[in-house]
């Protein structure tokens, strides 16, 4: 005599100890019964539970391991309406960029600043606003891949800019950039310098620094990655720690001659996931006016 399978409801209730919401337990029960093996229900429910977010201890820190979430942020702001995009002085529409932009620009010694939802978005917005349909010179040694398989050439392609490879993987000189810019077949809108934060080339190497690039007569954009605001770390009584040696900082990169600097706000800055564009006011304004800026703006 063939035994009847348990009801979906009774099987789902027997899985309550797993701690999933009841509708998910019902789904697991239905899948197991449909497969002809009710005993599979607990295995299916446990698989679902493994997909949920749980608290962990990130002993490596957000700089070394962002896959365990960004910096913990204590939300103490009361839940109430705020003047997010409203100018209380004029009674007119305001900008959500105004407050944070002024603060970050001041910290970096920049004319202006804006925030988007991550650093890849910051780079893409800069390229779309300033180099769409034109060439962007990048050293072959800086055409990097960041986490999740996202690559600089692919971000550039989506922006509508054209990648112009310069130099070699291990050695790129100022003369290489100048040669690429001076070619009659190229239309270089800007030079993009990318800090290779997740790898290092050592040995027979040569790098062109920002102060050298600033002599080329084209816009220089530097993506410094992790978001060190000031190499002097004036907020630390003992000065910058030794492990920051070699890490580019926004303030010093701008002082060296970069027109724009992009970086993350969720690593060294310790904020929520975000990306910043800082530098010349006219260039930041051009980025802010681009249609992509609204799509890439951070949530309220």
Which residue ranges define each predicted feature?
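Glycine-rich phosphate-binding segment of PLP-dependent enzymes
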Residues: 29-30, 59-60, 69-91
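Short glycine-rich or small-residue beta-strand-to-loop segments that form or flank ligand, phosphate
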Residues: 63-67, 85-87, 137-139, 262
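Short Gly/Ser/Thr- and Asp/Glu-enriched loop/turn motifs at secondary-structure junctions
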Residues: 5-6, 57-61, 270-272
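Glycine-rich, N-terminal phosphate-binding loop and its surrounding beta-alpha-beta segment
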Residues: 37-73
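Glycine-rich phosphate/diphosphate-binding loops and the adjacent beta-loop-alpha structural elements
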Residues: 30, 34, 62, 268
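Long amphipathic alpha-helical segments
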Residues: 1-47
């Amino acid at each position: 005599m063939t035994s009847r399978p348990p009801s979906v409801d009774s099987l789902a209730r027997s899985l309550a100890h797993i701690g999933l919401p009841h509708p998910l337990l019902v789904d697991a029960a239905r899948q197991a019964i449909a497969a002809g093996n009710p005993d599979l229900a607990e295995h299916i429910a446990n698989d679902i539970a493994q997909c949920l977010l749980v608290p962990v201890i990130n002993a490596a820190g957000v700089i070394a391991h962002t896959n365990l979430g960004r910096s913990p942020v204590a939300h103490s702001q009361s839940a109430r309406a705020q003047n997010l995009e409203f100018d209380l002085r004029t009674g007119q529409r305001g900008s959500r960029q105004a407050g944070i932009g002024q603060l970050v620009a001041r910290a970096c010694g920049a004319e202006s600043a804006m925030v988007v939802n991550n650093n890849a978005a910051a780079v893409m917005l800069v390229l779309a606003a300033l180099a769409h349909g034109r060439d962007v010179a990048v050293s072959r040694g800086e055409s990097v891949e960041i986490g999740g398989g996202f690559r600089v050439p692919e971000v550039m392609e989506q922006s509508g800019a054209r990648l112009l490879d310069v130099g070699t993987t291990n050695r790129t000189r100022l003369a290489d950039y100048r040669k690429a810019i001076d070619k009659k077949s190229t239309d270089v809108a800007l030079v993009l310098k990318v800090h290779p934060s997740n790898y290092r080339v050592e040995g027979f190497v040569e790098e062109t620094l920002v102060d050298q690039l600033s002599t080329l007569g084209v816009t220089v954009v530097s993506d410094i990655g992790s978001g060190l605001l000031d190499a002097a770390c004036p907020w630390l009584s003992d000065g910058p720690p030794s492990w920051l040696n070699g890490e580019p900082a926004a303030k010093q990169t701008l002082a060296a001659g970069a027109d724009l600097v992009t970086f993350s706000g969720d690593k060294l800055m310790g904020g929520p996931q975000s990306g910043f564009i800082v530098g010349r006011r006219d260039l930041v304004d051009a980025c802010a006016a681009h249609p992509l800026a609204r799509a890439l703006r951070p949530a309220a």
